[in-house]
Amino acid sequence: VLFRSVVWAGGTHRRTDGQVQRYAPQDVRFEVLRQWRSPHSGASYPVAMAVVLGKAADTMRLELKPLMDDQELDARASTGNYYWEGAVRSSAANATDASRKLLQGRGYLELTGYWRAQKL
């Protein structure tokens, strides 16, 4: 589970052996790979991204790519906003050791606050 907001970033990773790795804000970096502009709201979402986790000696790079771009929800009647949530494909590798096995997976990505500033 990873989170990023204007003021905070961090996350946890549960390994296959059950151990939990916690990531402090300085250990999580998000890189936009591709933007998608909604024809419905006009909002631009970073639907494809790389998440770099960890310190230099043991860094994991996780790439997230949507199964389809248009997964925007019109939630103006409930939350007052449009937001993007949907299915993604993932691939992960050790960023400092290319010989390590590439991992493939599926996931869920939620992107809020891209249509207009949210009132908290």
Regions found by a protein language model. Give the residues of each.
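Structured soluble/peripheral alpha/beta segments that form catalytic or ligand/cofactor-binding pockets
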Residues: V1-L120
